Amino acid sequence: MTHTNLAKETLLQFMQAMYSWERKATRSLRNQADKEMLKDELAAIFDQFCRSKKTLREREVSLSVRFPFDYKLETHPIVDEEYDGNQTYLYIKENRSGLETLYRFRMVFQKGKGWIDKKEWLDDGKWINSSL
């Protein structure tokens, strides 16, 4: 499997896991006992798919969820890709009520596995760091 295909597969699996978590979180965040469970589940998702960078994982602290969801595959398609050495960039377009945002995920490869290393969004021609 090529690095680009591995990167896509990793990102799509991450997005599916996050979408499931977001759906569950919208129903469960009001209950304090559920918050700990949701935090543990989110940490497990990040551990499985992401490099351990605090900037990526801010959602573990806030447990925030937006609606419409951030990781619904049907509304956040991969629209482009670039391969550069040991990393692949995957671009996702989000459309919220007519407002389009382009996100870029940097995927790196270690020990035969693809990892999410960075998420950014395009603002006025510049890439700005974003948390997951």
Regions found by a protein language model. Give the residues of each.
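Exposed alpha-helical structural elements
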Residues: 6, 10, 37, 41-45, ...
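Short beta-strand edge/turn micro-motifs at domain boundaries
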Residues: 100-131
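Short, aromatic-enriched amphipathic alpha-helices that serve as compact interaction elements
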Residues: 2-25
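Surface-exposed, charged secondary-structure patches
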Residues: 41-100
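Hydrophobic beta-strand residues in large extracellular and virion-surface proteins
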Residues: 14, 78, 90-92, 105-107, ...
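Short, charged low-complexity linear motifs
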Residues: 1, 35, 100-102
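A structured, charge-rich N-terminal accessory region that forms the first stable segment of a protein
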Residues: 17-58
